[in-house]
């Protein structure tokens, strides 16, 4: 039974400008060198490299960002945090010592957006500055960025009280 579910994608215009900017440069180089047969740049790479970069960055990067999403689910047993297609993490509710919905500074506190941090202090975020900080029983902290932070914190607290009260 899922008590709370939220799915977020990168929707910032500047992220997509960078993604499509990199892709456009790769497409331009590919068309110049492979399709038109004109070496691209002052010191052009071999054709196989143009093919590789075109597939990775001209096609792969936009597809990757299209499918990249942060999914958060709260169930009676655990909190699931998935940064598809990169990683997923399951945090048992019994390991959560403290829950706090708060405003944070993604760049200052965690170095930006995405999957960030260290083994003791991890953040999963996509956009904005609202999130839920979990303090685990071993002292580690996990920040989950959310567009519905208060609702997420309430769902976690409710599940902890209802299903894990002593």
Regions found by a protein language model. Give the residues of each.
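Cytosol-/stroma-facing membrane-proximal "stalk/adaptor" domains immediately downstream
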Residues: 146-166
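Short N-terminal helix-initiation segments at or just after the protein's N-terminus
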Residues: 14-19, 39-45, 72-86, 141, ...
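Conserved beta-hairpin
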Residues: 55-100
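N-terminal membrane-targeting/pre-transmembrane regions
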Residues: 1-45, 123, 149, 166
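Loop-to-helix transition at the N-terminal end of transmembrane alpha-helices
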Residues: 42-60
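A residue-level signal for beta-strand positions that form part of recognition/binding surfaces
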Residues: 1, 71, 131
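Non-transmembrane, membrane-adjacent beta-strand/coil modules in membrane-associated proteins
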Residues: 10, 81-147
